[in-house]
Amino acid sequence: ARVTVPQNTHDSWRRASLLSHGIRPFFLGAALWAMAGMALWIAALTGHARPAVGYGLLAWHAHEFLFGYVGAVLSGFLLTAATNWTGRASLTGAPLLALFGLWLAGRIALYFYASVGPYALGIDVALLLVVALWFAREIVLARDWLNLRVVALILALASSNIAFHHEVLRYAAPGIAARLALALIVALIMVI
């Protein structure tokens, strides 16, 4: 029997690049950030680096793995899964690069918070908001109403990111936002 491979499969192999699927830049970024974040954390703890994070190293470390790392993994997954769930094309090329750049800008801005100031917080929070809005648009256009619950969880995670920043800047009791974020991450895993 002869196997027929759809033409678009050949095309995707031919143009297999970092920006052809959302999972590629974000999962690579998450993996590299996990290693770099740990290296920066260890360097700071041993006195070999002095990050200008603007708040305590423990808070920065917790934030970067709850929102930086998870934000990249969640974004990469949703950009890929949305195509299967909605039947619509996902972001590729320059729009995908811009979204990945937003994630990377958040990591850099928070590491140099003392230089960037409160703008760093807006840059950081923007990724989850943009991903939630993009995903909501895809769901509405595909009339895939069941997955609106994922949008609600992403928006709740973005809200916990805002609350985290609010706490570490000493406007609220510390720790609640981090626990909320962890609970929301578990909820996302269960729903997805």
Predicted regions mapped to residue ranges:
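Hydrophobic alpha-helical transmembrane segments of multi-pass integral membrane proteins
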Residues: 1-192
